[in-house]
Amino acid sequence: MPTSHENALQQRCQQIVTSPVLSPEQKRHFLALEAENNLPYPQLPAEARRALDEGVICDMFEGHAPYKPRYVLPDYARFLANGSEWLELEGAKDLDDALSLLTILYHHVPSVTSMPVYLGQLDALLQPYVRILTQDEIDIRIKRFWRYLDRTLPDAFMHANIGPSDSPITRAILRADAELKQVSPNLTFIYDPEITPDDLLLEVAKNICECSKPHIANGPVHDKIFTKGGYGIVSCYNSLPLAGGGSTLVRLNLKAIAE
């Protein structure tokens, strides 16, 4: 005889597979979560267990089997320069190559959301591959790439960085983001008063009014915490070292703590 727990699990799975609002990909994702959360929760110290049960801390619903990290920050520049033996890809020769390589690698970056959380410092990554393209030719490619990200990896946790320097790629990304007004990818502009020209900062401010992005990060402050250019802004309030990451994320419930 099935137990009440087994019956409840089957009912949740049945609701997922028969949902009229979930896509097949979303159904697969939520079914996998049900299987993962059917496993025992990892062992915790008594105080941590109590804090979790009382709602003082939140595990962000990362699942009972943390087999994948929350934040991974690949060295995308190295990948574009050298390619990947594992993926049988050569390094990029031009902007089309670079964009194609990134779209492939993004599907192999592990994360809790099953989508890449960090997309890279895109203007710095892509600018070396522009070669002889005009601004219009760059804009067309970036807009196509931006739309691809939203349609195939539709997750607002997905985060890209630009700045502090100005470049045709930087401007193209700002134009595409303002025009398309997509939820994803999320975007942070890294500002440095010694590097960022005033007219670029003004353009960033106009974009914020137009599409509520990008967020602005203080470059010099982060340079002191990490090394210059050796980090990524991976969410609205998290920065981590490049070629590193973070295994998990725990939030404090300040209201519960105060009570």
Regions of interest found by a model, annotated:
Residues 2-259:
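Conserved catalytic cores of very large enzyme subunits
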